[in-house]
Amino acid sequence: MVKSEPKKKPQPGGFFQKFFRKPEKNQKEQRLTVQRSIPYLEMGRDGICRVEEHLYSKTVRFYDINYQLAQNEDKNTIFESWCDFLNYFDASIRFQLSFINHKSDMSEYNKVIQIEPQHDQFDDVRMEYAQMLKQQLAKGNNGLVRTKYITFSIEAKSVREAKPRLERIETDILNNFKVLGVKAYPLNGVERLQIMYETFHQEEQQKFDFSYDRILQSGMTTKDFIAPTSFLFKSGKDFMMGDTYGAASYLNILAPELTDKVLAEFLDMDKNLVVSIHVQSVDQLKAIKLIKGKITDLDRMKIEEQKKAVRSGYDMEIIPSDLATYGGEAKKILDDLQSRNERMFLVTVLFLNTAKTKQELDSAVFQTAGIAQKFNCTLNRLDYLQEQGLMSSLPLANNLVPIKRALTTTSTAIFVPFTTQELFMEGDSLYYGLNAVSNNMIMADRKQLKNPNGLILGTPGSGKSFSAKREITNVFFTTTDDIIVADPEGEYYPLVEALGGQVIHISSTSKDYINPMDINLNYADDDNPLGMKSDFILSLCELIMGARDGMEPEEKSVIDRCLPLVYQKYLNDPKPENMPTLGDLYDCLREQKERQAQRIATALEIYVNGSLRVFNHQTNVELDNRIICFDIKELGKQLKKLGMLIVQDQVWNRVTINRSGKKNTRYYIDEFHLLLKEEQTAAYSVEIWKRFRKWGGIPTGITQNIKDLLASREIENIFENSDFIYMLNQASGDRQILAKQLNISPFQLSYVTNSNEGEGLLFYGNTIIPFKDKFDTTLKLYGLMTTKPNEMGKYKEKKEA
């Protein structure tokens, strides 16, 4: 390790006094090294750091929640909980909030969005999609990683004494974060060292390479692995560490009031930045005594001014305005401390800017100062305290800057550490646009949700079908999942055909047939596949008979009696040619004596022997293609709902087969409200919706008719069993209903109010993120995915040519 330039011997009581022994007489003075400048003594594997001889600290990383987008009521709740969080810390605990923005190696992000060529006929659109993802990644600032930490320290005689106390505080902090709905976890020694390494090497791309075993092998210390090549604190206003320029500043709070957006504005900068808020609680009795003393001093000064006024012959009530103002503020603070559950804290807010060049550094500091000025504060450089400022920016909970501001709990809590959540997951994650607040790419894996079922909701022209097609394309390129589409409007076949999928056209004139009586031996969990199949047949018959209030018990019993007879031949010898059809059920019903059986058979007659007999055939299409589209546009009004229900049963067949092969099945249902509109189909659809997750199915309902969807009695079950909602622009009446149903704040609601195509809100579990997605219209994929009539016409012309 290259050592720093020789420095003057630190004076007694100076900053470095605690890190050295005083040289003996005639002993050559030791050179001050970079490692000795880093202000801690030991870093344990468990994350406990001995900062000074009797000072120990631990660090907890915490994540963001949607504070800026929350409803005012929720904001107030979060703010009050944050105040309670701060009040937890008594005078024996120092703590430091660290907010670190640093550039990351983009290769990590590129790995997540990487789509490799497969050397097949789809490589042209596959690589086009991959290029689009790279362009979207470049638009955001995903290369800038934002992390948040809280570090707390206590005084103890030994690590044995410190450890149980630190662990108890850590548990309390994690529980307090849980109350706030914030994910958090404690850091181990390696993770804490990595933060310091990244602070010292912010402008470098070299990864942190360290393990405690290497210390034993090499005889080096932890500091040797994190230290830069050199420190240079020549100038009083900035410094250098290695080849990186840096400047440490503090926030001078001049404004009488601050907003809860102040910290968010600083953290929104797209430059390397470390914001450290050091907080030391003051003993409550001492704080009250201090304020009372100040009030006494102010009253004494007021009396002196009044005496002076009397001697001078003017009104004794006329006193300096500052004196009156300070007196009123002091009394208010005293009242807060005594009766409003407020504490007093000594707070230091530090900023560490770094850059590759002096010019870039000055620009970054200027930008930071501009934000401070916006809130009537000033950003002051730590003149001749640059080293202390840098070292105090390390998450060690040891403030070496002697500049503190006394603030009450509420005033301290105004630095709310929460802004907006990000969603960028690894694994089988798919692209869902850019975060409308941070401009970062949204990558999410629905399989990681407790319930991956989803809805895509939007008005006509908002981009709902396009969004579904984009997800289908992404699934096809990056996973091995099967994809099935129920297409009542004939909008999906261009994409499905382009991806080598199978389009099954079902209509009264089509020669493509699917048999509603199809079953496989894996149809249900138990050894009785007929049990669940009977639910479907009953729903089918209810729909055919128009039984709005359901079928009579006698009618259900008759059907239930017939089903084992109808399926007996197939179950004894499961060959495709032995699969029964609706005609077999019809014949069996005719053989029964009950009038209910004859009534059902009469209702079935038009579907068996009449003009609507399209579903009375053996399935004559192969259903083993990876991507299948059931085009039921030409079925007509009488058969469309029936067709959607039958397609849903075919999908269930596929799901049960895929489950045994441990394969997921994605099912997209356009015009989903049609299945929920009728009581006969709604109950069965909801039952399937609930069962899909357990069997590896991932259904997605797509609709523009929100009123019809929300009018269904079953919508509560759909929402409760859907952890993924992709909400685009909504009509006025629908917005209010959805806001109440999903607890959407007015601010969040603005993202689905008169929003542009491809803009809205993404609900992923408990995370709500506003998104925007402007797809490049020049891409070949766009032509395959668009649903605009004029653009779809161009696709047809190209295909025919």
Language-model regions: role of each:
Residues 456:
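Hydrophobic anchor at the beta1->P-loop junction of P-loop NTPases
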Residues 2-418:
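Extended, folded cores of ATP/NTP-driven motor/assembly subunits in large transport
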